[in-house]
Protein backbone atom coordinates (compact mmCIF):
# COMPACT_ATOMS: atom_id res chain seq x y z
CA UNK A 1 0.00 0.00 0.00
CA UNK A 2 1.42 3.36 -1.04
CA UNK A 3 0.66 6.44 1.03
CA UNK A 4 1.41 10.08 0.30
CA UNK A 5 0.99 13.10 2.57
CA UNK A 6 0.48 16.52 1.01
CA UNK A 7 0.65 19.90 2.73
CA UNK A 8 -0.68 23.32 1.75
CA UNK A 9 -0.51 26.45 3.83
CA UNK A 10 -2.85 29.23 4.81
CA UNK A 11 -3.49 31.97 2.30
CA UNK A 12 -4.79 35.51 2.38
CA UNK A 13 -7.19 36.56 -0.35
CA UNK A 14 -7.87 40.13 -1.50
CA UNK A 15 -4.72 41.58 0.15
CA UNK A 16 -6.63 44.77 0.99
CA UNK A 17 -7.11 46.51 -2.38
CA UNK A 18 -6.99 43.39 -4.61
CA UNK A 19 -10.55 42.21 -4.02
CA UNK A 20 -11.02 38.79 -5.64
CA UNK A 21 -7.93 39.21 -7.88
CA UNK A 22 -4.95 38.95 -5.50
CA UNK A 23 -3.79 36.51 -2.85
CA UNK A 24 -0.65 35.24 -1.15
CA UNK A 25 0.48 32.20 0.82
CA UNK A 26 2.31 32.13 4.14
CA UNK A 27 4.59 29.29 5.21
CA UNK A 28 2.53 28.14 8.20
CA UNK A 29 0.10 26.92 9.42
CA UNK A 30 -1.49 24.58 6.89
CA UNK A 31 -3.60 21.48 6.27
CA UNK A 32 -2.34 17.96 5.63
CA UNK A 33 -4.01 15.29 3.51
CA UNK A 34 -2.92 11.64 3.63
CA UNK A 35 -3.89 9.44 0.67
CA UNK A 36 -3.55 5.65 0.79
CA UNK A 37 -3.73 3.72 -2.48
CA UNK A 38 -5.40 0.28 -2.52
CA UNK A 39 -5.52 -2.13 -5.47
CA UNK A 40 -9.17 -3.15 -5.10
CA UNK A 41 -12.22 -0.90 -5.49
CA UNK A 42 -14.43 -1.07 -2.38
CA UNK A 43 -17.39 0.98 -3.57
CA UNK A 44 -18.80 2.78 -6.57
CA UNK A 45 -16.92 5.92 -5.52
CA UNK A 46 -13.13 5.47 -5.81
CA UNK A 47 -12.39 7.78 -2.86
CA UNK A 48 -13.42 7.38 0.78
CA UNK A 49 -12.81 9.77 3.66
CA UNK A 50 -11.68 7.60 6.55
CA UNK A 51 -11.29 10.43 9.05
CA UNK A 52 -11.13 14.18 9.51
CA UNK A 53 -9.10 15.50 12.42
CA UNK A 54 -9.40 19.00 13.83
CA UNK A 55 -12.75 20.14 12.39
CA UNK A 56 -14.91 19.38 15.41
CA UNK A 57 -17.21 17.27 13.26
CA UNK A 58 -18.22 20.23 11.08
CA UNK A 59 -17.04 18.98 7.68
CA UNK A 60 -18.92 16.41 5.56
CA UNK A 61 -17.60 12.87 5.14
CA UNK A 62 -19.40 12.45 1.82
CA UNK A 63 -16.54 12.42 -0.73
CA UNK A 64 -18.62 14.39 -3.23
CA UNK A 65 -19.34 17.16 -0.73
CA UNK A 66 -15.95 17.57 0.94
CA UNK A 67 -13.56 19.81 -0.98
CA UNK A 68 -10.49 17.61 -0.37
CA UNK A 69 -12.06 14.44 -1.77
CA UNK A 70 -14.07 16.24 -4.45
CA UNK A 71 -10.92 17.59 -6.09
CA UNK A 72 -9.32 14.13 -6.04
CA UNK A 73 -12.36 12.76 -7.88
CA UNK A 74 -12.01 15.52 -10.46
CA UNK A 75 -8.29 14.76 -10.76
CA UNK A 76 -8.96 11.05 -11.37
CA UNK A 77 -11.48 11.89 -14.08
CA UNK A 78 -9.03 14.29 -15.72
CA UNK A 79 -6.06 11.91 -15.86
CA UNK A 80 -8.34 9.19 -17.26
CA UNK A 81 -9.67 11.34 -20.09
CA UNK A 82 -6.58 13.41 -20.93
CA UNK A 83 -3.57 11.38 -19.75
CA UNK A 84 -4.83 7.86 -20.46
CA UNK A 85 -4.36 6.81 -16.82
CA UNK A 86 -7.14 4.50 -15.66
CA UNK A 87 -7.71 3.60 -12.02
CA UNK A 88 -9.62 0.57 -10.78
CA UNK A 89 -8.46 0.70 -7.17
CA UNK A 90 -9.49 2.73 -4.15
CA UNK A 91 -8.12 5.72 -2.26
CA UNK A 92 -8.56 6.29 1.47
CA UNK A 93 -8.26 9.94 2.51
CA UNK A 94 -7.40 11.38 5.91
CA UNK A 95 -7.78 15.14 6.32
CA UNK A 96 -5.83 16.85 9.10
CA UNK A 97 -7.31 20.30 9.61
CA UNK A 98 -4.80 22.66 11.16
CA UNK A 99 -6.60 25.76 9.89
CA UNK A 100 -9.72 27.12 11.56
CA UNK A 101 -12.95 27.07 9.58
CA UNK A 102 -14.63 30.28 8.37
CA UNK A 103 -11.50 32.18 9.33
CA UNK A 104 -10.42 34.10 6.23
CA UNK A 105 -7.26 31.97 6.09
CA UNK A 106 -8.10 29.91 3.02
CA UNK A 107 -8.99 26.76 4.94
CA UNK A 108 -10.87 25.00 2.13
CA UNK A 109 -8.24 25.98 -0.45
CA UNK A 110 -5.48 24.49 1.70
CA UNK A 111 -7.35 21.20 2.00
CA UNK A 112 -7.93 21.05 -1.76
CA UNK A 113 -4.35 21.93 -2.67
CA UNK A 114 -2.89 19.42 -0.19
CA UNK A 115 -5.16 16.67 -1.54
CA UNK A 116 -4.30 17.46 -5.15
CA UNK A 117 -0.54 17.55 -4.69
CA UNK A 118 -0.76 14.19 -2.87
CA UNK A 119 -2.96 12.65 -5.57
CA UNK A 120 -0.61 13.86 -8.30
CA UNK A 121 2.35 12.27 -6.51
CA UNK A 122 0.39 9.05 -5.99
CA UNK A 123 0.03 8.65 -9.77
CA UNK A 124 3.55 9.65 -10.78
CA UNK A 125 3.00 13.41 -11.17
CA UNK A 126 1.17 13.42 -14.53
CA UNK A 127 -0.06 17.01 -14.02
CA UNK A 128 1.65 20.34 -13.59
CA UNK A 129 0.73 22.56 -10.67
CA UNK A 130 -0.97 24.90 -13.11
CA UNK A 131 -3.23 22.05 -14.22
CA UNK A 132 -3.99 21.22 -10.59
CA UNK A 133 -4.99 24.81 -9.86
CA UNK A 134 -8.11 24.37 -12.00
CA UNK A 135 -9.35 21.56 -9.74
CA UNK A 136 -8.51 23.50 -6.58
CA UNK A 137 -10.63 26.39 -7.85
CA UNK A 138 -13.54 24.02 -8.48
CA UNK A 139 -13.11 22.78 -4.92
CA UNK A 140 -13.93 26.30 -3.73
CA UNK A 141 -17.30 26.01 -5.44
CA UNK A 142 -18.08 22.98 -3.25
CA UNK A 143 -16.84 24.74 -0.12
CA UNK A 144 -18.53 28.11 -0.48
CA UNK A 145 -20.52 28.16 -3.72
CA UNK A 146 -18.08 30.31 -5.67
CA UNK A 147 -15.17 29.07 -7.80
CA UNK A 148 -12.68 31.80 -6.89
CA UNK A 149 -8.90 31.60 -7.18
CA UNK A 150 -7.49 34.16 -4.77
CA UNK A 151 -6.95 31.46 -2.12
CA UNK A 152 -6.78 28.33 -4.28
CA UNK A 153 -4.06 29.60 -6.62
CA UNK A 154 -1.57 30.77 -3.96
CA UNK A 155 -2.27 27.64 -1.89
CA UNK A 156 -1.12 25.55 -4.85
CA UNK A 157 1.55 27.82 -6.37
CA UNK A 158 2.81 29.90 -3.46
CA UNK A 159 3.99 33.53 -3.72
CA UNK A 160 1.60 36.36 -4.59
CA UNK A 161 -0.85 35.46 -7.33
CA UNK A 162 -2.59 38.08 -9.46
CA UNK A 163 -5.69 36.84 -11.30
CA UNK A 164 -5.84 38.80 -14.55
CA UNK A 165 -8.74 36.79 -15.94
CA UNK A 166 -10.96 33.84 -15.09
CA UNK A 167 -12.08 33.16 -18.67
CA UNK A 168 -9.60 32.12 -19.77
CA UNK A 169 -7.80 31.61 -16.47
CA UNK A 170 -4.70 33.82 -16.47
CA UNK A 171 -2.60 33.75 -13.30
CA UNK A 172 0.46 35.93 -12.76
CA UNK A 173 3.01 34.90 -10.13
CA UNK A 174 4.73 37.71 -8.24
CA UNK A 175 7.77 36.86 -6.14
CA UNK A 176 7.74 38.52 -2.71
CA UNK A 177 10.40 40.96 -1.53
CA UNK A 178 12.97 39.02 0.48
CA UNK A 179 12.37 40.88 3.74
CA UNK A 180 8.59 40.97 3.60
CA UNK A 181 6.95 39.18 6.53
CA UNK A 182 3.29 38.49 7.09
CA UNK A 183 1.51 38.54 10.42
CA UNK A 184 -1.80 36.70 10.58
CA UNK A 185 -4.06 36.95 13.63
CA UNK A 186 -7.20 34.85 13.94
CA UNK A 187 -9.67 35.97 16.62
CA UNK A 188 -11.73 33.18 18.15
CA UNK A 189 -14.91 33.94 16.27
CA UNK A 190 -16.36 32.86 12.93
CA UNK A 191 -17.54 34.90 9.98
CA UNK A 192 -19.23 33.04 7.13
CA UNK A 193 -17.96 34.02 3.68
CA UNK A 194 -21.50 34.11 2.33
CA UNK A 195 -22.55 36.66 4.95
CA UNK A 196 -19.40 38.73 4.50
CA UNK A 197 -20.15 38.89 0.77
CA UNK A 198 -23.77 39.81 1.35
CA UNK A 199 -22.83 43.15 2.94
CA UNK A 200 -20.84 44.30 -0.09
CA UNK A 201 -22.37 46.80 -2.52
CA UNK A 202 -23.49 45.56 -5.94
CA UNK A 203 -21.97 48.65 -7.56
CA UNK A 204 -19.55 51.39 -6.53
CA UNK A 205 -18.98 54.99 -7.69
CA UNK A 206 -16.41 55.49 -10.43
CA UNK A 207 -14.31 57.63 -8.10
CA UNK A 208 -14.12 54.74 -5.61
CA UNK A 209 -13.16 52.29 -8.35
CA UNK A 210 -10.45 54.65 -9.59
CA UNK A 211 -8.96 54.89 -6.11
CA UNK A 212 -8.99 51.10 -5.73
CA UNK A 213 -7.35 50.55 -9.14
CA UNK A 214 -4.61 52.98 -8.22
CA UNK A 215 -3.90 51.11 -5.01
CA UNK A 216 -3.82 47.71 -6.76
CA UNK A 217 -1.37 48.98 -9.36
CA UNK A 218 0.77 50.59 -6.69
CA UNK A 219 0.81 47.42 -4.57
CA UNK A 220 1.97 45.30 -7.52
CA UNK A 221 4.63 47.89 -8.35
CA UNK A 222 5.76 48.00 -4.72
CA UNK A 223 6.14 44.22 -4.60
CA UNK A 224 8.10 44.11 -7.85
CA UNK A 225 10.38 47.01 -6.89
CA UNK A 226 10.75 45.85 -3.27
CA UNK A 227 9.58 49.30 -2.24
CA UNK A 228 8.27 48.72 1.28
CA UNK A 229 6.98 52.26 1.74
CA UNK A 230 4.94 51.98 -1.46
CA UNK A 231 3.57 48.61 -0.34
CA UNK A 232 2.37 50.25 2.85
CA UNK A 233 0.79 53.22 1.07
CA UNK A 234 -1.01 50.89 -1.33
CA UNK A 235 -2.55 48.60 1.30
CA UNK A 236 -5.79 50.56 1.34
CA UNK A 237 -9.16 48.97 0.59
CA UNK A 238 -11.98 51.41 -0.13
CA UNK A 239 -14.44 48.76 -1.37
CA UNK A 240 -14.75 45.77 0.99
CA UNK A 241 -13.04 46.79 4.23
CA UNK A 242 -15.42 49.68 5.09
CA UNK A 243 -18.38 47.29 4.83
CA UNK A 244 -16.79 44.30 6.55
CA UNK A 245 -14.90 46.05 9.36
CA UNK A 246 -18.04 46.34 11.55
CA UNK A 247 -18.44 42.54 11.35
CA UNK A 248 -15.10 42.02 13.13
CA UNK A 249 -15.18 43.11 16.80
CA UNK A 250 -12.35 45.55 17.50
CA UNK A 251 -11.05 45.63 13.92
CA UNK A 252 -10.31 49.36 13.82
CA UNK A 253 -8.39 49.17 17.09
CA UNK A 254 -6.49 46.09 15.89
CA UNK A 255 -5.52 47.80 12.65
CA UNK A 256 -4.34 50.91 14.47
CA UNK A 257 -2.36 48.79 16.92
CA UNK A 258 -0.60 47.08 14.01
CA UNK A 259 0.33 50.40 12.41
CA UNK A 260 1.49 51.85 15.73
CA UNK A 261 3.74 48.80 16.20
CA UNK A 262 5.46 49.43 12.87
CA UNK A 263 3.44 47.48 10.30
CA UNK A 264 3.63 48.63 6.70
CA UNK A 265 -0.11 48.08 6.41
CA UNK A 266 -2.96 46.02 7.81
CA UNK A 267 -6.32 44.79 6.53
CA UNK A 268 -8.87 41.99 6.66
CA UNK A 269 -7.67 38.55 5.57
CA UNK A 270 -10.08 37.40 2.88
CA UNK A 271 -13.61 37.90 4.15
CA UNK A 272 -12.44 37.81 7.79
CA UNK A 273 -12.49 37.57 10.71
CA UNK A 274 -8.70 37.07 10.56
CA UNK A 275 -6.57 40.16 10.07
CA UNK A 276 -3.18 40.35 8.36
CA UNK A 277 -0.33 42.84 8.37
CA UNK A 278 2.93 43.26 6.44
CA UNK A 279 6.25 44.22 7.98
CA UNK A 280 9.79 44.61 6.65
CA UNK A 281 11.42 42.40 9.31
CA UNK A 282 10.52 39.39 11.43
CA UNK A 283 11.16 41.31 14.64
CA UNK A 284 8.67 43.99 13.66
CA UNK A 285 6.17 41.40 12.43
CA UNK A 286 6.23 39.65 15.80
CA UNK A 287 5.78 42.93 17.68
CA UNK A 288 2.90 43.77 15.35
CA UNK A 289 1.27 40.41 16.07
CA UNK A 290 1.49 40.89 19.81
CA UNK A 291 -0.04 44.35 19.51
CA UNK A 292 -2.88 43.01 17.37
CA UNK A 293 -3.63 40.22 19.83
CA UNK A 294 -3.67 42.68 22.70
CA UNK A 295 -6.09 44.91 20.82
CA UNK A 296 -8.45 42.01 20.17
CA UNK A 297 -8.29 41.02 23.82
CA UNK A 298 -9.07 44.55 24.98
CA UNK A 299 -11.90 45.05 22.51
CA UNK A 300 -15.50 45.04 23.74
CA UNK A 301 -15.77 41.37 22.73
CA UNK A 302 -12.54 40.54 24.62
CA UNK A 303 -11.49 38.04 21.95
CA UNK A 304 -8.73 35.52 22.42
CA UNK A 305 -6.73 34.93 19.24
CA UNK A 306 -4.02 32.90 17.55
CA UNK A 307 -1.09 34.52 15.80
CA UNK A 308 1.43 33.42 13.17
CA UNK A 309 4.42 35.24 11.70
CA UNK A 310 6.16 34.00 8.58
CA UNK A 311 7.72 35.03 5.29
CA UNK A 312 5.64 34.66 2.16
CA UNK A 313 5.59 31.01 1.04
CA UNK A 314 7.32 30.61 -2.32
CA UNK A 315 6.91 26.83 -2.60
CA UNK A 316 3.16 26.34 -2.54
CA UNK A 317 1.62 22.91 -1.96
CA UNK A 318 4.20 20.19 -1.37
CA UNK A 319 4.75 16.56 -0.45
CA UNK A 320 5.93 16.01 3.11
CA UNK A 321 6.10 12.19 3.20
CA UNK A 322 5.67 9.05 1.09
CA UNK A 323 5.67 5.36 1.97
CA UNK A 324 5.39 2.26 -0.21
From Swiss-Prot:
Pfam families: GHMP_kinases_C, GHMP_kinases_N. The lineage of its organism: Bacteria, Pseudomonadati, Chlorobiota, Chlorobiia, Chlorobiales. PROSITE patterns: GHMP_KINASES_ATP (PS00627). Keywords: Amino-acid biosynthesis, ATP-binding, Cytoplasm, Kinase, Nucleotide-binding, Threonine biosynthesis, Transferase. This is Homoserine kinase. Catalyzes the ATP-dependent phosphorylation of L-homoserine to L-homoserine phosphate. It is found in: Cytoplasm. It is an enzyme of class 2 (transferase). One of its GO terms (molecular function) is ATP binding. The gene is thrB.
Amino acid sequence: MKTVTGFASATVGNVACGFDVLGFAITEPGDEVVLALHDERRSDCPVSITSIVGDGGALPLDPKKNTSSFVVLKFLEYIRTTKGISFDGHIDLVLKKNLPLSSGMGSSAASAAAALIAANELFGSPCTKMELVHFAIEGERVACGSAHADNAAPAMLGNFILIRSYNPLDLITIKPPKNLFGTLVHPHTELKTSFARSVLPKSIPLSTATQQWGNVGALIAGLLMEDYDLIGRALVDVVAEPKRAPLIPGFNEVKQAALDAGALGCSIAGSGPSVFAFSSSRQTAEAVGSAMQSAFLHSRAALQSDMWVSPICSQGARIISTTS
